[in-house]
Amino acid sequence: MMRGGMGNMQKMLKQMQKMQKEMQKAQEELAEKTVEGTAGGGMVTVVANGHKQILEVKIKEEVVDPDDIEMLQDLILAATNDALKKADELANEMMGQFTKGLNIPGLF
């Protein structure tokens, strides 16, 4: 009975190591993937990667009004929040396969 138990433990350990490598690969892929958040009908675009790092902010010239800086700030904020939401969704999609069936709040 002990021998069967040890064999199962080794098998489980190998499965965990495989899953850990797959998770690490998925994390690396997340860093490479990008998402775009937009606001103002595409007047402001924010690009982020799957790790929620902002990589680029694009602002169309026609939206820049020195007399209405507040509107531009609002558009940048909205586009940034949109990009971060999409980055979260991407991470959940990619990493969710590893946590499927586990009920750990806030993991992914």
UniProtKB/Swiss-Prot annotation:
Matching Gene3D superfamilies: Nucleoid-associated protein YbaB-like domain
List every stretch annotated Disordered.
Answer: 1-32
Q: Name one Pfam family in it.
A: YbaB_DNA_bd
Transcription in keyword set: no
What GO molecular function terms would the record report?
DNA binding
Sequence ranges of Low complexity compositional bias: 9-18
Q: What is this protein called?
A: Nucleoid-associated protein GK0018
Q: Which organism is it from?
A: Geobacillus kaustophilus (strain HTA426)
